[in-house]
Amino acid sequence: NVKAGDLGGFVEGEHNLETELSDSAWIFDDAIACGSAYVNQDSSLHNTAIACDHAYVSCGSALYGQARAEDDAYLRGAVMCGNAYASGFAQIICGPDKFKPPILSGHCKVCGSVRGNVKVCGAGAVLPGEEILNDLKDITVLISDSGRRILRGTVKDTLRPRKEHAPQKEKSKKRGMER
């Protein structure tokens, strides 16, 4: 929680950061919010992360390391770390299951739309106009420099034990009956 007098990163102006007491959005360390970028709704920038141009960072989004959101990037409930980069009209949005936010890490670049349980890492990329949507809890879409994969959770991989059936008694056949 942020208290009055706490020092944070660089904020170009009041237009970059929500200042309502009920909102704990904050710029930490040497992070920067500049241009027309806006950070609100409990979101945060850490380390040397940057939100610039018209980037909108909201709904608990967090940028760490040297992550950068620029141009008209829209982040809602997302996590960016390392040298992750969101630009253009990128949309990185948490799905209905808020416990599995989209995660961008490494040197990845997102210029398209990512929603839900999606991880973009390494040198992975989502191109302008491309949409990666996954609202399933037990499946993760992984985009990396080695390709795109679907990772299944362990829930689907466990089999129920097989039921043991008692041996059935043979029915006696009546004589004289035809089949």
Residue ranges and their predicted role:
Residues 1-42, 47-54, 59:
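Extended, small-residue-rich solenoid/repeat segments and analogous flexible loops
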Residues 3-13, 122, 139-141, 179:
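Polar/charged, compositionally biased leader and regulatory segments
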Residues 38-153:
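Glycine-rich hexapeptide-repeat left-handed beta-helix
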Residues 134-178:
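Gram-negative host-targeted secretion-system effectors, predominantly Type III and Type IV
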